Amino acid sequence: MKLKKRTIFLAFLDLCAISLILVVYVVPNFKNWWITTSVSTGKHKWFANIFYSDEDIKEVLTNNQVIEIDEEVNLDDITFENEKKDSYDSVYDEQILDREDGALYKLINIKEKDYSGYLVAIYDPSRIQLATSDYYGQSLKMIAEKEKAVVAINASGFNIAQGYANGMVIKNSKLISNYGYNRHGGGLVGFTNKNVLMLTTGNSTEAISKGMRDAVEFGPFLIINGKPATIMGNGGMGTANRTVIAQRKDGIVLFLVIDGRGANGSKGIDMNGLIKILTRYKAYNAANLDGGGSSTLVINNELINNPRGYYGDNWERPLPNAWIVK
């Protein structure tokens, strides 16, 4: 009897090993998904090397990347003409423009087969500003509460161990920090004194001279002057929770937050999926922000999405800064 149980157990292990080999080396797209998702995380890049060599990883990343539009944002293209209409170009345009009189924002549910999340339309971009944490350990809800923010999303990437924001941070037209590095392409993402979303690869001095008021450094840039970036494969950042900031030509700002890692049944989204959503809602300029467990949306001091990080559901990471609406 003991021998039979042992035989069954060994057979089970063999079956598991064979199944793993088939998944890792035979199932289409598993390699791309595993490598790109692993290397885009803050702490688990080494996962990619569990199954694949450095040569495999390099090849996959070469074939999965974002080719950004090589243009400066045309700041004068933003018109700030976004009155309600009697007819709309699409159901998505209607979702944005059909709102209550005097509304500051509108929350729109995003639901597709493999992912879900939220889009917030901000009708007065002059109410958007960058808020910073007072100390390492403050969550988005804590930042929003101290700032009396109506809407808030996460912004910069950051050093997980020490909490400082990666890359340049501009607030009130001054460079307030410049630590670490930005490894996701893009550049400075922020608003000018005229409340236009500016995306620029220039340094802080150049950006401020052009009117940059508040900004963080991240990317990639997904849309510039209405032209979407070219996405090779899945874009090189895999499938995960995402946060995006965008602006339509009519001046309306879009905060997009997509859940991932199985939260609420949402697997997450890649760069192709983000551009699909942004194009539907007529984003004219758009940039990816920090994602993964950092992707968080708070409205009126209530956590709206389901951030899933190292400690499970609805666990908010401490953040260095946030985009808020006051």
Briefly describe each language-model feature range:
Residues 2-180:
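Zymogen propeptides
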Residues 115-117, 146-148, 184, 217, ...:
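Extracytoplasmic
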Residues 117-121, 188, 221, 244, ...:
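Conserved hydrophobic/aromatic beta-strand scaffold that supports enzyme active sites
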Residues 121, 150-154, 189-190, 197-198, ...:
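Structural recognition of the beta-strand scaffold that forms the well-ordered cores
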Residues 134-137, 203-207, 258-263:
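Short, solvent-exposed aromatic-acidic interface loops
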Residues 158-235:
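Active-site-adjacent helix-turn-beta-strand microarchitecture at beta-sheet edges
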Residues 163-181, 231-284, 289, 294-326:
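Conserved, well-ordered active-site substructure
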